[in-house]
UniProtKB/Swiss-Prot annotation:
It catalyses: cytidine(1402) in 16S rRNA + S-adenosyl-L-methionine = N(4)-methylcytidine(1402) in 16S rRNA + S-adenosyl-L-homocysteine + H(+). It comes from Mycoplasma genitalium (strain ATCC 33530 / DSM 19775 / NCTC 10195 / G37) (Mycoplasmoides genitalium). SUPFAM superfamilies: Putative methyltransferase TM0872, insert domain, S-adenosyl-L-methionine-dependent methyltransferases. It comes from the Bacteria. One of its GO terms (molecular function) is rRNA (cytosine-N4-)-methyltransferase activity. GO terms for cellular component: cytoplasm. Keywords: Cytoplasm, Methyltransferase, rRNA processing, S-adenosyl-L-methionine, Transferase. This is Ribosomal RNA small subunit methyltransferase H. Gene3D superfamilies: Putative methyltransferase TM0872, insert domain (1.10.150.170), Vaccinia Virus protein VP39 (3.40.50.150).
Amino acid sequence: MLNNQQIHQSVLINEVIHNLNINPCGNYLDLTAGFAGHSQKILEKLTTGTLTINDVDKESINFCQKLFFKNNNVVIIHDNFANFPVHLKQLSITKFDGILMDLGVSSHQLNQPNRGFSFKNDGPIDMRMDQSNQKNTALTVLKNLTEQKLSLILKKYGDIKHPKPIAIGLKKAVQTEKNLTTTQLAKVVKECATGFEKYQSRNYLAKVFQAIRIYLNDEITNLKTALTFIPNLLKNNSRFLVIVFHSIEEKIVRNFIAKLTSFIQPEALPIKLTPAYQLITKKPILPSQKELELNPRSRSAKLFVIQKN
């Protein structure tokens, strides 16, 4: 069995462990376990504490089950993190000392041609986070979308400045080519690119693939849903850590933090009140130069740390 470092390099591991402020007897929740990079490090810090790990990807879950099959301190759940509250009944835990969300796509997912997440490998246009339960692939969705709707998706989730030519080209390609692949899709996008975007092909392609993936997996809705219940899962003096990778996620998380930490100190009181929630660091934590050199894919990662007092 390959170890998790051979499959995927989790970002900001040292920073995550430091900021979780782990209690060896505490209960922790990793809502996006992936290939257990963060989870394994959390578990190393626990004695009688527990770790609940969740992931939507069955391949990740299978890996974690093999990795932790002898560990009674670990509970593994296969589901989208937006559905996590329905699983609380099977747990003896209702609140946690720390919760982690890493919103990035794993290196393993990107590197596997059959997953269809990357334009660098030729494979089916799949892009499903949950291949075991999701029926529609990205190719199916592209076939069913109108040019207008696809254009809106590219602009909203990929920040594509001139999405219409791309949408027209993609619709024509999926209708005329029976078994269109990821590299063929990338070729269509390159041919349809206009203006300045034509000269930023790699970044541009990544944004197009990102937009399709986000829409297919309903990532934004799922993130917003999770953020509504996470505060209720936190104990007092616990922390919530979230790692974002693109501006859409970051905006949602920043708005969430702003509302959660909004607090006005009453002037009339003789003592200062402690806000219910606070940011541990005013600015998001970024990867070190050493990590950037070892793992260039970490360059977009930003870690936010919120404490419930």
